[in-house]
Amino acid sequence: MMRFLDGHPPGYDLTYNDVFIVPNRSEVASRFDVDLSTADGSGTTIPVVVANMTAVAGRRMAETVARRGGIVILPQDLPIPAVKQTVAFVKSRDLVLDTPVTLAPDDSVSDAMALIHKRAHGVAVVILEGRPIGLVRESSCLGVDRFTRVRDIAVTDYVTAPAGTEPRKIFDLLEHAPVDVAVLTDADGTLAGVLSRTGAIRAGIYTPATDSAGRLRIGAAVGINGDVGAKARALAEAGVDVLVIDTAHGHQVKTLDAIKAVSALDLGLPLAAGNVVSAEGTRDLLKAGANVVKVGVGPGAMCTTRMMTGVGRPQFSAVLECASAARQLGGHIWADGGIRHPRDVALALAAGASNVMIGSWFAGTYESPGDLMRDRDDQPYKESYGMASKRAVVARTGADNPFDRARKALFEEGISTSRMGLDPDRGGVEDLIDHITSGVRSTCTYVGASNLAELHERAVVGVQSGAGFAEGHPLPAGW
């Protein structure tokens, strides 16, 4: 199991910034020889779970992340009918092709500009009676009257291919194409999807997270109030693949009762629950019937719990202790919160997490549900907010009477409005997944691990000063 460099854990708790991994002798020759799949029942083939945050987890995010091997957990405040629609949408998506934004020929340039950035590939497909007739790029819309019809500006010189064409062939066809996106059609000529050159490469690297029927996987969260069992059953009937019982303070009797109620239904789905930061909390949740425990109180970017209450724990130490306790009972943990760099993912996995939950980092992507906005310097951003914030509480308590709703809104513990800028080099969630998995694969080669279990077994972790952490930062502007 993971050990500390000097053989002894320090007498104080640690964050991800406080620690580093020491390289070991390795026989792993290539990053592509590393298996990133997990064994916690979630079905992920990369250790990435998207947090159940309204500003992050929607159907575009769910489709895209599952295609690359992760899974999205839909937020608990999403109504059951909306969950059903989202699950049906995601499970009907192609395992290779992206679902494009579509426009009718008479839609306006203004309509196109509002929709193009819903997807990272940067185009919208103009369709007539289900068949593609052109592509619209952002550059096509610049300097054009916003009421112009898209049929008048659509690009008609683009690569087409039948659905089922090998991604490598699509890659080759796009080498000298004027638009870096191929449009694929079914036998009757109707639109099947699109694929970019980068998407074609990714199709050969990632394995989609799929259910027993070969469809993309998706999860959903439920809170601990009301008839939790009925809500969980409704989510299972909607077709979700993973259930998450979610509350800020998971180590309470109400959470344990909710876990027992859902576990007793025997729905045949993996059950995650949280959040906790101690071995005792982990054991209690697993004994109540959870298969996976979510670990983290206060490390998230949108969370103010520690500053409001003084409650929480540095995340690396919390993950390390809880993972050890879970392993003794045959359970697993997800490291939830505090992830800002690929190294943090690697450290959480080295400490024993089976998956890492990411929220705010993914809010600043094309695939997150929010609208793309621009600041005064024309830099793109999206809004994010915490799930215990006033904004989220108001949305979640919409069915309450006005007095109760106002009373609950007084006790928010999160940021209601935050700007997450889109990285110009990594604007899509797939770009961030590439960034993360590349880092974790490299970690494994440095450690001599061919899979995540071996990473945890072989990792040697040291403790560093703030200056040590700063030393590891690149200096692109020199010094």
Swiss-Prot record:
<keyword id="KW-0129">CBS domain</keyword>
<dbReference type="InterPro" id="IPR005990">
    <property type="entry name" value="IMP_DH"/>
</dbReference>
<dbReference type="GO" id="GO:0032264">
    <property type="term" value="P:IMP salvage"/>
</dbReference>
<dbReference type="InterPro" id="IPR050139">
    <property type="entry name" value="GMP_reductase"/>
</dbReference>
<feature type="domain" description="CBS 2">
    <location>
        <begin position="154"/>
        <end position="212"/>
    </location>
</feature>
<feature type="binding site">
    <location>
        <begin position="246"/>
        <end position="248"/>
    </location>
    <ligand>
        <name>NADP(+)</name>
    </ligand>
</feature>
<protein>
    <recommendedName>
        <fullName>GMP reductase</fullName>
        <ecNumber>1.7.1.7</ecNumber>
    </recommendedName>
</protein>
<dbReference type="InterPro" id="IPR001093">
    <property type="entry name" value="IMP_DH_GMPRt"/>
</dbReference>
<dbReference type="Pfam" id="PF00571">
    <property type="entry name" value="CBS"/>
</dbReference>
<keyword id="KW-0677">Repeat</keyword>
<dbReference type="Pfam" id="PF00478">
    <property type="entry name" value="IMPDH"/>
</dbReference>
<dbReference type="InterPro" id="IPR046342">
    <property type="entry name" value="CBS_dom_sf"/>
</dbReference>
<comment type="function">
    <text>Involved in the purine-salvage pathway. Catalyzes the NADPH-dependent conversion of GMP to IMP. Has no inosine-5'-monophosphate dehydrogenase (IMPDH) activity.</text>
</comment>
<keyword id="KW-0660">Purine salvage</keyword>
<dbReference type="GO" id="GO:0006166">
    <property type="term" value="P:purine ribonucleoside salvage"/>
</dbReference>
<comment type="subunit">
    <text>Homooctamer composed of two tetramers.</text>
</comment>
<comment type="similarity">
    <text>Belongs to the IMPDH/GMPR family. GuaB1 subfamily.</text>
</comment>
<dbReference type="GO" id="GO:0003920">
    <property type="term" value="F:GMP reductase activity"/>
</dbReference>
<feature type="binding site">
    <location>
        <begin position="296"/>
        <end position="298"/>
    </location>
    <ligand>
        <name>NADP(+)</name>
    </ligand>
</feature>
<dbReference type="InterPro" id="IPR000644">
    <property type="entry name" value="CBS_dom"/>
</dbReference>
<dbReference type="InterPro" id="IPR013785">
    <property type="entry name" value="Aldolase_TIM"/>
</dbReference>
<keyword id="KW-0521">NADP</keyword>
<keyword id="KW-0560">Oxidoreductase</keyword>
<dbReference type="GO" id="GO:0005829">
    <property type="term" value="C:cytosol"/>
</dbReference>
<feature type="active site" description="Thioimidate intermediate">
    <location>
        <position position="303"/>
    </location>
</feature>
<feature type="domain" description="CBS 1">
    <location>
        <begin position="96"/>
        <end position="153"/>
    </location>
</feature>
<dbReference type="GO" id="GO:0005886">
    <property type="term" value="C:plasma membrane"/>
</dbReference>
<comment type="pathway">
    <text>Purine metabolism; IMP biosynthesis via salvage pathway.</text>
</comment>
<dbReference type="InterPro" id="IPR005991">
    <property type="entry name" value="GUAB1"/>
</dbReference>
